[in-house]
Every structure is written in structure tokens, then in C-alpha cells.
């Protein structure tokens, strides 16, 4: 068992934390806004650890679902299931165990949060299969990656206001932006194996579509900032996030594989900048 631990860690991408961070930033945004900048330490621990656990479970299910495709993609041909080092049932069992651990974490929380966790589990588990029939599966991914937003509001306020769903919508557009950059890396392989991605759906308009999605995301956060009366520190964070989006354009405009991958990874800074602006605004109100 312990000898196989490195394989399991590779399966759930513990060596690639970017995915967990892309889930965590919008969840932290929601925790801070829902609590007026004062989330409790237990909630921070629950949502942070839960985010990592569910992202790990999602990776295991994704590799199980894509096991017959990954062998034909340069970037994924050596993943543990595809290479035969881990059996398919092991990935499913690991995903189930991680999901159970995540559910145990939220047992102290209210009933609404638990109910939303069931919906979150369904969306996360079904996402990998949408690549077979949905033209823009990245939009579905945005719902899966953003479900921590309504759950955070539910845990703190015991209801989910419209603001939470607006923030989730922003996350959908952001996810389409960064995961289209990711899909541009595998475009040629995805054409051969016949799966659907936003990079293929957008075609020659892929760069324009990505920048439009960034614009919508940032535009929604303009509305949030105005609605909540955020101050200068928030707008500095917003401006830094907008700068990141502009920088991504310089990386993806020529559609070079590694530059597109670099743009995808750099979204950690975009998400971090938005959160820093939100956290800084609330911190300034304490004094």
C-alpha cells in the first residue's frame, strides 16, 4: 500500500497544486464576502481542506473516465491508469474515499450546506463525461469548480443570496477562459480522438472568446465591487487581475502550446489578485 502511495499522489495531482488553487480562490472570495471579511478559522480549515479533497477526487474520476483517451494524448499518455500502474477500480475507490472524507468535514455545518454538497458531488463526478457530448464542457467545469461559492454562503448565512449565484456565473466565465487555454495545448490530439473542448468549438475565434470570457468575469467583479461599496484596495486587486488577463493575451495570441499552458498556470495570480483585493478591503475596515 505505502509503496503505491506515490502513484496515488500522482493520480490526484498532488504534484500539481494549480487545480486546487483555481478552486480555492473563488471559494475564499465567497467566505470573505459572506462573512463581511471575518470567516471563522474552523470554516477556513473545512473549506480549504475540502477543496483539496474534492479536487483530488475529481482528478481520480477524470482519469478513470478518460483512460481510453489519455493514451493518445502526449501530455497524458503516462498517467498512472493509462500506463497500467493503477487499475481503474482503484481510481474509483480512491475518489469515493476522498469524497467521503470531504463530506465528513462538513458534518458540523448546517443542512443547506450538506444538501448543496450532494449537488456539488454530482457535478464534479459527471464533468469528465461531458467532454463526449457537450460543445463547451469547460462551462460545466466552471460550475463544478465554483460550487464552493454557494456552499460558503450557505454555511455562513444559512441561505444562498443572488450574489452567490452571480459570483458562480463569474467563475463559469473564468473557467472557460483558463481551461480553453489548457485545451489549446491538446488541440491536435483532441481532434484525433474525437472529444469536445471549447478550443475546438471556438476554432479560429478561440483567443477572442478567451478574452471575452475574461472581460465578462472582470466586469461582473466590477459590479460586485460597486454593489458592496468596495474601496481603493479592492480596485487595486481588480486592476492587477485585469493586468494578468492582458498578459495572458500576449501568451496565447500565437497559439503556441507551451505559451498557452503558461497562461493557464498564470491564472493562479489572477485569482489571487482578486482575492487579495477583497481581503485587503475588509482588513482596512477593521481599523
From Swiss-Prot:
One GO term of the biological process aspect: ubiquinone biosynthetic process
Signal peptide span: none
InterPro entries reported in the protein's UniProt record: HB_polyprenyltransferase-like (IPR006370), Prenyltransferase (IPR039653), UbiA_prenyltransferase (IPR000537), UbiA_prenylTrfase_CS (IPR030470), UbiA_sf (IPR044878)
Pfam families the record matches: UbiA
Membrane topology, from the record: Multi-pass membrane protein
Catalytic activity annotation: all-trans-octaprenyl diphosphate + 4-hydroxybenzoate = 4-hydroxy-3-(all-trans-octaprenyl)benzoate + diphosphate
Location of the protein in the cell: Cell inner membrane
Cofactor(s) the protein requires to work: Mg(2+)
GO molecular function: 4-hydroxybenzoate polyprenyltransferase activity
Pathway participation: Cofactor biosynthesis; ubiquinone biosynthesis
One cellular-component annotation, GO: plasma membrane
Superkingdom in the source lineage: Bacteria
EC number(s) stated in the UniProt entry for this protein: 2.5.1.39
Annotated keywords: Cell inner membrane, Cell membrane, Magnesium, Membrane, Transferase, Transmembrane, Transmembrane helix, Ubiquinone biosynthesis
TM stretches of this protein: 41-61, 92-112, 133-153, 160-180, 218-238, 267-287
Role according to the record: Catalyzes the prenylation of para-hydroxybenzoate (PHB) with an all-trans polyprenyl group. Mediates the second step in the final reaction sequence of ubiquinone-8 (UQ-8) biosynthesis, which is the condensation of the polyisoprenoid side chain with PHB, generating the first membrane-bound Q intermediate 3-octaprenyl-4-hydroxybenzoate.
UniProt record similarity statement: Belongs to the UbiA prenyltransferase family.
Protein name listed in UniProt: 4-hydroxybenzoate octaprenyltransferase
Organism annotation: Paraburkholderia xenovorans (strain LB400)
Gene designation per UniProt: ubiA
